[in-house]
Amino acid sequence: MKLTKITAMAAAIATVAGLGAVAASSANAQVVTDGEKTITLNATSADQLTGHTFKVVKVASYDVYGTAPNQSVTLKTEDGLKTDIAKYLKYTGTGDPLAWAQQQDQAKLDKSTTSPWLGDGTTRGLADKLASKATTTVTSTLSNENKQATFTLDSPGLWLIVDQAVTGKSSKALPILAGIKLTINNTVYSSGSIDMKNQTASVSKTVTDQTVAAGQDASYTITTKVPNYVGYKVNGYQFTVSDKFAHNAPLSYKTDTLKVTVDNKQLTAGTDYTVTGFNSTSKTFIIDLSAYIKAKGFKGTPVDDSKFTDADLVGKNVTVEYKATVTGSTGNTGVANTPTIRYPNDPSNNESKQEVPGPRSRSEPSPSRDFHGS
């Protein structure tokens, strides 16, 4: 029999996992045990994969039922995860929780194919819920200039891939649900390929005049973007932008000239952000934008395990402008500033931070650093 009703939830979890259309389970379904057993993670930068290690857990098998050419596919939950998945889906029956979810008119899981890969948060929540179950270490084979990582797994099905490493050049990714490649009767149900879902962070700067005379003001601009905070814990989250001159630089920050904008909206000091060190005797200052991100990225009062669910600020432009008065000779090259951004690089631990330094020359972007999404 060919099922014609493909529920929204079925399509949703399929899309998230790299699967095509799937349908509700049937008594005569047969678990797929042969064929493809690989999943490939795709990255835009080698830094997203180089140095990373992974652990996995199988979430569900593929069940194929019916006769050619009217075969259909469903997901069969692995026994060891049934209790956790049923609890997450609020399923109180005794059957297969994913099979039950696939038969509901109202989707129980969602899809998201673009950054920051949140959707309505239901599938993101399931991946986070199961992350601790991924205890099997798996080795990947890197290819395509280290921008692809291919895993050979034990059997076909839906797998959860959990990044274990934080490197100096990239952050730890959120848990990733992915399906091994599956093709039946020339129909591709799963591509076996999915994005690593990291993004690239950088900070750049400009100076309006590099050879300002003593007693005059030099204008500086720092630009960066809000990193992907979705899936990170709200409590303890911190995103800062800082700038620094050499300790003997002949410059003095000019009070009341600091201006901070996000997405072309000027923010209010003391309310949207805090700033320390921006005074005439300092050579460095730090702007903390954490309060603004928390206000925009999470609704309500967070508890210990609350995570960001609103992605409106992700990737928005951040601009910092200020003036500094020249107090001595700056020579023919002016005085270079060194901006830095700092943010958590491990979704499970806000204490682990990534620092991205700005360029050493006067008007270049910094070396990029990668940060997650899923």
Question: Model-flagged regions — what are they?
Answer:
Residues G18, S25-Q48, A178-K233, S242-F245, ...:
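Serine/threonine-rich, low-complexity linker/repeat segments that form flexible spacers/stalks
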Residues P156-N186, I222, N235-Y237, P302-S352:
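Serine/threonine-enriched low-complexity regions used as flexible
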Residues V57, K225-P227, A246, S290, ...:
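Solvent-exposed residues in well-ordered beta-strands and their adjoining turns
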Residues T135-E145, V162-S202:
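Long amphipathic alpha-helical scaffold segments
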Residues T92-T167, V262-T325:
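Extracellular adhesion/glycan-binding regions together with long Ser/Thr-
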Residues A46-K87, Y91-A99, T223-T261:
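Low-complexity, serine/threonine/proline/glycine-rich extracellular segments that form mucin-like
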Residues M1-A29:
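Secretory targeting and sorting signals
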